[in-house]
Amino acid sequence: MRQYTRRNVLKMLGVGAVTVVGLGLVGCSGAGEGGAASSASEPVPASQAFAQAGVWMQYDGDEQIGKDVEIERILSFDGNGNVAVYQCNGATFGDLNGLSNEQIIELAKELDRAVFEAEKQAAIESADEAIQAWQQCYDALKAEADAGTYDSMNNYGAYGIEGVPEEERAAAIEEFQIALENTKSSLDAANEGQAFNEAAEYQEPQPQPYTLALETDGSGNVAAGEEIRFPARRFSFYQIEVDDTTDLESPETRFRVLADYGWHNDAEIPENVFSAPEDSIGLYSFNYSTTQAVYDTTFGGYSGLATVVEEGHAGFTWDTTDAEGVEVD
């Protein structure tokens, strides 16, 4: 996956070095766009934090936020109970310094598209390699069958139809033809899958409803954990590969691979490029959440999920069991 330097990020946003200086204060106070969640004298419950329009960054919760810590996804809350989730492998917290919420969202869109294009290209290249190997294999076997020589056949210690006893040749040829037909059918399926990959077009993620779920302790009265659940979009491409193309290229192994193991293309063509299974993020550090400055920007939140806050922010906490709109076990 491509790594994005701060210069790359600024180019993607069309922001020059001089402009960044002017935005330096926006990074520190830009969270003011998100309302009270950015400046709080008391810890903010999750239901209040996510109910406001704002941008949150998901990262590895085992790491301390820092300029080189990678951001896995960016979550954009619309203030109406919905969240749009962007994949952004390669960006870091340092890349967000001085950016407003709007600019972070624009960056998220560019990064999400980049992830899509990278996965699409990887799927196309992998399938293309497999298709080329199998096509060459099929062409070679077809030429042998058309010539009546069946040179790749080696069931009796010698290659070709001449090595097969006369009384068993019909059965051997039938076996060869079955392998050839199966190869052609699977090759056709692979080409269809590749066409699916090539036709795939990027679409921006749309805001989807999220829910907050609270887990209680043995008494049922005290919060013991909380998580946010949401549909997390995935990119689905046709995936197929050949483990060892040399087996299909060699006349000594080509037919054996097809006849003994068969080539069954079990890879399925996805119904849609985009799927959205439910995902969740645990909201840890319930008593308090530390804040961390990166350059001129201060981040705070839960372990693994952070937003831009003002210096001195009191942090974020779990909801109580009577919080409105929160599912309780």
Predicted feature locations:
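N-terminal glycine/threonine-rich, aromatic-flanked beta-hairpin/loop signature
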Residues: 64-164, 169-240, 244
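Edge beta-strand at a domain terminus
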Residues: 269-329
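N-terminal secretory signal peptides and thylakoid transit peptides that target proteins
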Residues: 1-16
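C-terminal motif of bacterial Sec signal peptides marking the signal peptidase cleavage site
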Residues: 24-27
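A eukaryote-biased sequence property
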Residues: 184, 195, 200-202, 207, ...
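Mature extracytoplasmic/lumenal regions of exported proteins
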Residues: 228-291
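Bacterial lipoprotein signal-peptidase II cleavage site
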Residues: 29-37
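Tryptophan-anchored aromatic micro-motifs
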Residues: 40-70
